[in-house]
Curated annotation (Swiss-Prot):
Taxonomic path: Eukaryota, Metazoa, Chordata, Craniata, Vertebrata
Key words, A-Z: Calcium, Disulfide bond, EGF-like domain, Endoplasmic reticulum, Glycoprotein, Isomerase, Redox-active center, Repeat, Signal
GO MF: calcium ion binding; protein disulfide isomerase activity
Enzymatic reactions: Catalyzes the rearrangement of -S-S- bonds in proteins
Gene that specifies this protein: CRELD2
Glycosylation sites: N248
InterPro entries referenced in this protein's UniProt entry, alphabetically: EGF-like_Ca-bd_dom, EGF-like_dom, EGF-type_Asp/Asn_hydroxyl_site, EGF_Ca-bd_CS, Furin_repeat, Growth_fac_rcpt_cys_sf, LE_dom, NOTCH1_EGF-like
Protein name: Protein disulfide isomerase CRELD2
Range of residues in the leader sequence: 1-21
Amino acid sequence: MRPPAPAVLGLLLLLLPTGEATKKPTPCKRCRELVDKFNQGMVDTAKKNFGGGNTAWEEKTLSKYEFSEVRLLEIVEGLCEASDFECNQLLEEQEELLEAWWLRLKKKHPDLFEWFCVQTLKACCSPGTYGPDCLACQGGSERPCSGNGHCVGDGTREGDGSCQCHLGYQGPLCSDCMDGYFRSPTSETHSICSACDEACKTCVGPTNRDCGQCEVGWVRQDDACVDVDECAAEPPPCEDTQYCENVNGSFVCEECDPTCMGCTGKGPTQCRECIAGYSKESGQCEDIDECSLAEKPCLRDNENCYNTPGSFVCVCPDGFEEAEDTCVQTRPAGAEATEASPTQPPSREDL
């Protein structure tokens, strides 16, 4: 088989139908995936179907199988799933090139990806280079972006070669430390950016004594940045129905227990005062049972008192109805109750 012209193949591979560029894999990705599968196929077929027996015979036979068309066919047949249209299309277009590399060029060009995807099809670039002309990434192809970031388009015919820095790094070559990080040498030529202490906005070392500037919510004290206790400020930063909790560099306002009128912390034991209907008992705000007080709160004749959380209600008993601000008997004592007559005290939900 005669390989097609590489320039034509490269053009066919790079052209994608209008409107589908975002849906299909890039030419470089398709090429790389095919090469990865081919390389895996070589691993899977290495010394296949041989093991034990006549070693001398095996070595002689294996040496023939290693570079044979039989082995190539086994590899090629396993490259693409039947349903993978993109893979099968690329394989159909480039199978002759793969055969040429396998039979004649493998020793001269042992790196299939470099020969097939970079040099021949021009679908990809070598690592550390980018774009149509495979230019060196920022910082050089050997160590793009100072080793602290990603080169946009690295290894492809796309991108602009600029650096997208890893966390903690900044600058066109990702060689500078961001605020909140300091330079920590690892060798004579390389250094890393390590995180400052949380108290520091800028720093030269890892502790709160190495701060150049303190973060918001921290102040310099005795040559170190220490947390500001905002909860101790006057006036207090939280609402009257809240209590303040100091956290590193800030504070949070939490709601008081519903039984409290002002509080110093969480729960009914932290109330400054109790709301109406509650009183301090054993160190916490407890509901007052108004119905059990010596001075009865329900003053109408025949009226029953029911305690509720923080209050009470006055209700006419079974067989009585409220009329003209009093409880009037509507059913003689002992008479059978009707559906309209209450037969039990109201529930808390009803109240």
